[in-house]
Amino acid sequence: MEIGVIGAGKVGKALVRGLLDAGYDVGGIACGSAGSTGKAAAELGVPGMTPAEVLEHCGTVFLAVPDRSIRPVAEELAAGLDTGRKRLDVGIGPDIVVAEATGLESGSGGMPEKKRDRLVPPEDAKTVFHCSGAAGTGELEALAAAGCRCGSFHPLQSFAGGPASWQGVYVALDGGPAAVETGEALARALGSVPFTVPAEDRALYHAAACVCSNYTVTLMTLAQKLMSRWTGSGPAGLQALLPLLKGTVANLERAGEAASALTGPIARGDGTTVEKHLAVLPPEFMALYRGLGLETVAIAPELDDVQRKRLALLLEGAECLPLRKVQ
C-alpha cells in the first residue's frame, strides 16, 4: 500500500520518516508550492508531487496541513475525483455524512432518519486522514462525497522537526469503521498506541493536550523569568530549571496517577512556605500562583482536612501574609 502525505511541516515530516522506518512505501509528498515540495522531497527521499497526484497515486493519504486549510484542501482534491458514487458511510457521531449522486447531506444538518444509512465504501476507495486534534471528520466531507473513506489521525505528541520516535505515542482516531481500522493498523506499525476520540469530544480532548504541552511552556517561561534574576540571563535560567522539569517528568512516568508525583510545600502541608511565596511574588504572578495553588491543594493526596482548609484560605487571600500577624 502506497501512502502519501500532503503537507511537510513538523507532523508531515515526522509521518514520512515514521512510515519509512516502519517499512511502508511513501509514494509521494506535496506542499503548497513546487519549491517547497522539491525541498521536502529531497530532504525526505520520497517523490515530490502535486496534491492531486498524491491522491491519485496513493491509496492512503494524510493531510498534515493547518486546521484552517483542511477543508479547502479537501475540496480542491475532491474536485478532481469521481463524484458519481451513490452512497457511502464516511464517519460516526455528529460528523456522519451520507453522499448521494445528487449531492451531500450531513447528519448535523437535519438529515431525515431514513437517510442515515451506514453503508460500506467500495473496496477500492481511498482513505484520507487529517491530522488535526480539534477538527472533526466533517472537514473532509467533500472527499467523502467523492467516494473516499475519511478519518482523523492525531498523534498526541509535540514534534520538534528533526528525527522523531513514534514509539509509545498515543494516536487519537475518529472516522468511519474502515478508516479507523486502517488508522489503528498504521498507528501500531509506527509503534504507537491507537485510541478513539469521537467528534463531539475532539475540542475537549485537544484542550487537555494544550494544557499539558502548551501551558507547560507558558509556566516554564514565567519560571525562567524569575530564575534569570540569579543566573544572569534567560537561557541560563531555563537551563537551571530543566533538570527540575525532567525530574518531575520522571516522577510522573513512575507514578501512574499524576497527583501521586506531587512534591513541594503544598504536598507536605507547609503553609509557612506558601505564605513566604505570596509575600514576595511580583504582582503579575500572583493570580496564576494562587489559582494553580488552589488546584494543587485539591489534588494533593497526603493532606488532611485541616491542612487543606488552611492552605486554601491562604491562597484565596483570606489570611494575612507573612511579616504580619497571622490571625
Model-inferred region functions:
Residues Q307-Q327:
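NAD(P)-dependent dehydrogenase/reductase Rossmann-like domain
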Residues T248, E253-Q307:
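Interdomain hinge/lid region at the active-site interface
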Residues M1-E53:
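NAD(P)+-binding Rossmann beta1-loop-alpha1 motif at the extreme N-terminus of oxidoreductases
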Residues A40, L143-R149, A164-R254:
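Internal alpha-helical scaffold of NAD(P)-dependent oxidoreductase catalytic cores
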Residues G27-C31, V128-C131, V171-D174:
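Short, hydrophobic beta-strand segments that form beta-sheet elements in well-ordered domains
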Residues S106-S108:
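Serine residues within intrinsically disordered or low-complexity segments
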Residues A34, G38-K39, E43-G103, P112-A164:
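Rossmann-like NAD(P)(H) cofactor-binding subdomain of soluble oxidoreductases
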